[in-house]
Amino acid sequence: MASKGAGMSFSRKSYRLTSDAEKSRVTGIVQEKLLNDYLNRIFSSSEHAPPAATSRKPLNFQNLPEHLDQLLQVDNEEEESQGQVEGRLGPSTVVLDHTGGFEGLLLVDDDLLGVIGHSNFGTIRSTTCVYKGKWLYEVLISSQGLMQIGWCTISCRFNQEEGVGDTHNSYAYDGNRVRKWNVTTTNYGKAWAAGDIVSCLIDLDDGTLSFCLNGVSLGTAFENLSRGLGMAYFPAISLSFKESVAFNFGSRPLRYPVAGYRPLQDPPSADLVRAQRLLGCFRAVLSVELDPVEGRLLDKESSKWRLRGQPTVLLTLAHIFHHFAPLLRKVYLVEAVLMSFLLGIVEKGTPTQAQSVVHQVLDLLWLFMEDYEVQDCLKQLMMSLLRLYRFSPIVPDLGLQIHYLRLTIAILRHEKSRKFLLSNVLFDVLRSVVFFYIKSPLRVEEAGLQELIPTTWWPHCSSREGKESTEMKEETAEERLRRRAYERGCQRLRKRIEVVEELQVQILKLLLDNKDDNGGEASRYIFLTKFRKFLQENASGRGNMPMLCPPEYMVCFLHRLISALRYYWDEYKASNPHASFSEEAYIPPQVFYNGKVDYFDLQRLGGLLSHLRKTLKDDLASKANIVIDPLELQSTAMDDLDEDEEPAPAMAQRPMQALAVGGPLPLPRPGWLSSPTLGRANRFLSTAAVSLMTPRRPLSTSEKVKVRTLSVEQRTREDIEGSHWNEGLLLGRPPEEPEQPLTENSLLEVLDGAVMMYNLSVHQQLGKMVGVSDDVNEYAMALRDTEDKLRRCPKRRKDILAELTKSQKVFSEKLDHLSRRLAWVHATVYSQEKMLDIYWLLRVCLRTIEHGDRTGSLFAFMPEFYLSVAINSYSALKNYFGPVHSMEELPGYEETLTRLAAILAKHFADARIVGTDIRDSLMQALASYVCYPHSLRAVERIPEEQRIAMVRNLLAPYEQRPWAQTNWILVRLWRGCGFGYRYTRLPHLLKTKLEDANLPSLQKPCPSTLLQQHMADLLQQGPDVAPSFLNSVLNQLNWAFSEFIGMIQEIQQAAERLERNFVDSRQLKVCATCFDLSVSLLRVLEMTITLVPEIFLDWTRPTSEMLLRRLAQLLNQVLNRVTAERNLFDRVVTLRLPGLESVDHYPILVAVTGILVQLLVRGPASEREQATSVLLADPCFQLRSICYLLGQPEPPAPGTALPAPDRKRFSLQSYADYISADELAQVEQMLAHLTSASAQAAAASLPTSEEDLCPICYAHPISAVFQPCGHKSCKACINQHLMNNKDCFFCKTTIVSVEDWEKGANTSTTSSAA
């Protein structure tokens, strides 16, 4: 192996030591006196060297081995103890007892030190116990859930409900609930968080037991422990499902040693002394330089020392590493000796100096150690470094994290070490994503935030979507000063965090370097393979928590990756003018169908990939010149047939881990083990990716490219970046795409992975972290409420004043804590830079979707998550980053809103998208989009043909599709224009609960007259659009209201039973949903009648009369059910059941009233008469229902004024804040008109014999006869029937025509059955 140093390379074989005492003199060695001085300087530098090591005999390379042996001799008292130590029983190497010392199901790491709970409350103990003396061990907390950590005896018996501390002679500390346990429980200690270290101490001389958290003593927890014959205590833990920790019994240096206490596992004392002496010699080499010309030794700074190929220096180092190399493979020595040495270099020198020394050290390791030795050393070094970074406390200047990251960067700058770590360690063995995470402090006082942010402040209102912001009082001078002081503190914190983030970005820049391909594959392409596997594990294991990267890590990883990605993207643009800037980035559509990037089993827009390859193979050939290998299609078909049989061989290929279970379970080893650093070595099975069978000449447009499947590991740089005749990832460019590449193909794959990361867990975590801001708002509201009560409380009530003062103090202290923690969250998660990253990702997705849409049918190959990320990232920008940062301040905000609106409008009903979930997401996003003025205006800005196409899709018949969301969209376009439909909170709730701040709230109305006009134009076009749409709306209204009535009957029956009954909350929710659907359907009918009244009132249209009669029938049914005296509806409303808050008279009656007023008051006289006659002709019509609207029990006598309404009754007049005076006047006019018309109709009506009534409805006289069968009914019944069915009611004969029929008439008029 070769190593680089001072521009020269040296072969390790030339300087291998030999045992031959008679070897010849090596040429190039300096003269004897200088050699003696040099060797004495190097090997006498150890402070602990025994006298024998410094003899008067001149030192040379012949007697140096003997001298080294004497130097490394260790006194007898420092030798490791191989037998039993007094006070301890068990193996000298302490691990978890996975063979018999456990209860429940647990997953144990390969090193038998990390454990994950895999059952309700599993327990496990160690293999070694203690009965005398003072002992301790450390537990690294990987998750902050329910765990009980401590000690137990071998006689303790545990189960799935009782763990450590729940039995006699077992003692535990629980930082989740902040308690100590020994059969009973009391408060103790502090709350722990992920990243903390708990030290468990037991003093069996005094019989006491205590705990420390991050080196700070929590005090004595238990006294008077049972001691004596047969009493020995084991370290033990009980943990709930998915919780994880790692133990350190002494196999590594303790992070927080305690004087007088001994770790359960003895350190390798003798080897530690030898390693420290050898390190002293090594440091001496780096500080001395030979001057053979002058014959003297020169002192040299380590950062300026260079290996110049001098044989004397090389042989000296070879002797040192002959003894040092085996020691550097041991975990304890790497962390205690090598890590401390390297950290000292980083802490004392500048970054440049530290980098120089670390680079020299790594060069020497690779030169003088065997490959397997240096690889083990580097692996242990990175594991220790990661552990130190993750479990370091947060200090105000983040100095510890900065030092660990600087050392990581220095190591990764060494090309050979970087490639080895990237290929074998970073993603395979380590949780390397931890390096990009900045943990949030649970205890702000320990993190120094009180000094950094001495003044606290919190906003007084919420600006999140869906929450009505309260009127903000004018800011006082004192509040303004507090806010500005708080913002200055936040700025100081943000600057310190930015230093750490920049170091993390530097790490990723090193991993994404593609210019280090001398003698091997460049780092970027190794990273791509590992990164894709990382994504596969997290995508395929979403239900298996141990296999997932924690979402808080993923958020930080995504932001650092975007920064590094954009750096390289713009760097490539600087040297390639034809490429694009990162601001114009997108993923070309051919990446989704050429198979060069593996999307695992993620759903495509058009369904499964195997299905798309079969159904769209002709389109692939014609548009992209791609032919799928027939063998590929055949193997895919066989995979589909054998899908149920796949898991067995897949699991057989995975290595088993140590399982702490009662019997053998065929569990695959989890990918993210509980250890802070250990992961799975062999995580993945082979995954498929399609690669070119590379042609050797340019392709003509008529030639096709046949593709075949390769595993991810088999891809080469050429498969990704392409070559002269190979487009790599961009194989199969459609004609719509430009010929010039956007950037390097490898960066496109990284960008694709970043989008996938956001979809996997980042969005979910962004929503979760908003909880801190919500807590601040809730406590601020509680504090204001308490202060108001203090001001109103009489001074004589000192007891109440004392309680209120106490509450005020508690709320103030909690707000101080939360406001500082919120500052940390805003700096690490919701800063302006993070917001720009998410915004950039949104724009990338929008451009990707737009380019994919242009490919026609090939758009179906796009993974669903691109649409999901576009929807969710917009939601995050709008809801999660305020009020500190506003989306409206982002560059190109209006244009982005419009582009997203165009995508939602076009694709919510796109036939190329088949997935139910993604179609629902698109529909819900569009429904949310039209609720808010800014986004609704964006919908109105999209091209007119797209707007019309969107409305046409909304007006499609409701059958055979999810219609509820469509209906909500139409309602939101209307809200603010309907009768009494301008409220933001349900008026009937405000009348009963004036001060309830938790009432359901709605957005302020923002109707769209433009989209309403498109709807009117479309309903007037063609003879079938309006009838089919309205018929489906009437059908759904009939269903929804009937279901609602049936459910409230069941609720009423349950409430009237003598025994105590609880109505199922799910049933109440469904009932309320049916009511809300009924109201929304009525509002859509109101909008339709208002915009296009002729659809119902122009009887020259063949379906108008039928639609009007159906409408009148349903309106009468609703009115009769809701307005009857002491009826079912009244009784259920009076119950005020939780979950039925929206069910009341007002919402449904004003919707019905709006329709009736439009039909009977606002239209021309002729149309009003038609509507009146149809309404009165319906047998269910009752004038009393119309009187009910104005609070009148009976209709008034003709010519008399309306009496004052009864306050106990429902009346629209009681809602003057929501119903205008003009609207009330129209209702009164409608009542007067119907009173007069019903009286005239009653006087003019003639009795009808039963034989002449329609045999279907028994409400109207027979007026139509069917041909050819001759059966009869009224026109309303047969017209409604023919909308859905062409068979006769009675004989099932196909109806050819319907003829008018009148008793006694000799002629008839024929009309078409259609």
UniProtKB/Swiss-Prot annotation:
Recorded protein name is E3 ubiquitin-protein ligase RNF123
GO cellular component annotations of the record: cytoplasm; cytosol; nuclear membrane
Q: What class of enzyme is it?
A: transferase
Q: Could you tell me which residues carry N-acetylalanine? A: 2
Lineage of origin = Eukaryota, Metazoa, Chordata, Craniata, Vertebrata
User: What does it do?
Assistant: Catalytic subunit of the KPC complex that acts as E3 ubiquitin-protein ligase. Promotes the ubiquitination and proteasome-mediated degradation of CDKN1B which is the cyclin-dependent kinase inhibitor at the G0-G1 transition of the cell cycle. Also acts as a key regulator of the NF-kappa-B signaling by promoting maturation of the NFKB1 component of NF-kappa-B: acts by catalyzing ubiquitination of the NFKB1 p105 precursor, leading to limited proteasomal degradation of NFKB1 p105 and generation of the active NFKB1 p50 subunit.
Pfam families xrefs: SPRY, zf-C3HC4_3
Which residues take part in binding Zn(2+) 2?
A: 1269, 1271, 1288, 1291
